[in-house]
């Protein structure tokens, strides 16, 4: 698969301390999805999608159960989605999606991460117009044409299907991601490495040397924040 999706898979199978952060972030996401709808994935498509991704990230059952049980309770804890945009070195662009119970804290933390790691916060919309929201599905396979035909027959709005190194990558309109998954399952595909809604950069930049190291430090600082759910960028091979 492409380097970008290989990196996503690597993060999902990270070890030691990184796992606890990933599990905690999924716990919040599962809680919010269950709280906003029914705590049953069969009647709550948003929860079903989060649980699918949690499975890929090998989130333990007890973490999932705890989040769903919390949503069933009488807790009044409220989480708010947020998006921040900014710039790194040499034309690099970053989108940060958050889920937080304290917007002021999160905004300050994201701004600090940018400021202390060679980046600059931008205004809303200053970066996102250079990205396109897409559904992305990655799984083992080789015949891109056959997968494309399966999805077309299921009336899925599929944009592209790529095959590389024994891996299929499907790009769909974001509203058709669930439909594409169901179509693939109906055709016998059960295991998926990536099922995500992604912000895909329209163009990428290549960083080297100090610029690349600075950028990696900035991304690490952003992803280390407990309130940050996803970080998107336009740097190639990262």
UniProtKB/Swiss-Prot annotation:
Keyword Cytoplasm among UniProt keywords: yes
Coiled-coil regions, chain positions: none
Membrane is among the record's keywords: no
InterPro entries: Integrase-like_N, TACO1_YebC-like_2nd/3rd_dom, TACO1_YebC_N, Transcrip_reg_TACO1-like, Transcrip_reg_TACO1-like_dom3, Transcrip_reg_TACO1_YeeN, YebC-like
UniProt keyword list: Cytoplasm, DNA-binding, Transcription, Transcription regulation
Domain of life per record: Bacteria
Organism of provenance: Streptococcus thermophilus (strain ATCC BAA-491 / LMD-9)
Primary localisation category: cytoplasm
Sample GO molecular function, one term: DNA binding
Entry protein name: Probable transcriptional regulatory protein STER_0242
Family as reported in the entry's similarity comment: Belongs to the TACO1 family. YeeN subfamily.
Record localization: Cytoplasm
One GO BP annotation of this record: regulation of DNA-templated transcription
């Amino acid at each position: 698969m492409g380097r970008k999706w290989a990196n996503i898979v690597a993060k999902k199978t990270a070890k030691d301390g990184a796992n606890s952060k990933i599990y905690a972030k999924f716990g919040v996401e599962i809680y919010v999805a269950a709280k906003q709808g029914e705590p049953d994935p069969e009647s709550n498509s948003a929860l079903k999608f989060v649980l699918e991704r949690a499975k890929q990230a090998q989130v333990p059952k007890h973490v999932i159960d705890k989040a769903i049980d919390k949503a069933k309770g009488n807790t009044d804890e409220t989480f708010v989605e947020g998006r921040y945009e900014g710039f790194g070195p040499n034309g690099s662009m970053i989108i940060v999606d958050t889920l937080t119970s304290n917007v002021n804290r999160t905004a300050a933390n994201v701004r600090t991460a940018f400021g202390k790691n060679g980046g600059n916060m931008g205004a809303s919309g200053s970066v996102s117009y250079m990205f396109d929201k897409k559904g992305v599905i990655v799984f083992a396979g080789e015949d891109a044409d056959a997968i494309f035909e399966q999805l077309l027959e299921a009336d899925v709005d599929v944009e592209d299907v790529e095959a590389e190194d024994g891996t299929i990558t499907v790009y769909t309109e974001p509203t058709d991601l669930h439909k594409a998954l169901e179509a693939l399952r109906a055709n016998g595909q059960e295991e998926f490495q990536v099922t995500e809604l992604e912000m895909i950069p329209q163009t990428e930049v290549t960083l080297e040397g100090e610029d690349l190291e600075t950028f990696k430090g900035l991304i690490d600082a952003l992803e280390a924040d407990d309130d940050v759910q996803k970080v998107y960028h336009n740097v190639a091979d990262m």
